[in-house]
Amino acid sequence: MTRTDLEVASDFVHGWVASPKQRRARLGRTLPVAAVQVAALSHPDLAIRRSCLFLLDHYASDASSDIFRRALRDPVASVRESALHGLVCERCRHEDICVTEVVTDVIEILAFDPNPEVRHKAVAALARLIGRDGRAGEAIARAAHHDSDAAIRLTAQIVADSGQPHVRSRKAALRDVRRAARSRSS
């Protein structure tokens, strides 16, 4: 009986999660990449999709850029966050990312993703790419004026004003917006 890619990937994810941390790196080298790529896009369990994206980011990120890009359209926000991270993270890659393609994708996420958490992470990703593609700064400046979420507007404005690649957490941005609203009403 032949096992499907979804079964192979699911079994691998469960085995990886159950393994001691010191064994995971060795297990990661045996990653069934094709099966995990299929599962990252089509497994019915969102936890498996997220885990597959995590594994691809850490063990096969260079070969999985298209998978990350396609997973940006997942209906679940936390899966899109994982896909966004996999697309922009350079730490686990051996090859350089294609900045032009990545910035194009992240600008689209910032402009159109319905989830403010995902858009906040898009601001953070673009902030790290400002010096490598001018469109990143332009998109952040647009978000500072036009995003529907006040915390994203504030975060984007801070990045646009400072040019710093570091973005505070969404929780901190929400706190700053509430604090500013209280001080205006006082």
Locate each region found by the language model:
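Alpha-helix N-cap/helix-start positions at coil->helix boundaries
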Residues: L6, V17, L46-A47, A77-S78, ...
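Alpha-helical solenoid scaffolds in large eukaryotic transport, assembly, and signaling factors
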Residues: R23-G28, L55
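Amphipathic alpha-helical scaffolding segments comprising HEAT/armadillo-like alpha-solenoid repeats
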Residues: R3-S10, G28-S42, S61-R73, R93-L110, ...
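Eukaryotic acidic, Ser/Thr-rich intrinsically disordered low-complexity regions
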Residues: H145-S186
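Alpha-solenoid HEAT/ARM repeat scaffold
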Residues: L6, S10, R50-S51, E81-H85, ...
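N-terminal "cap/leader" segments of large eukaryotic alpha-helical scaffolds
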Residues: M1-R24
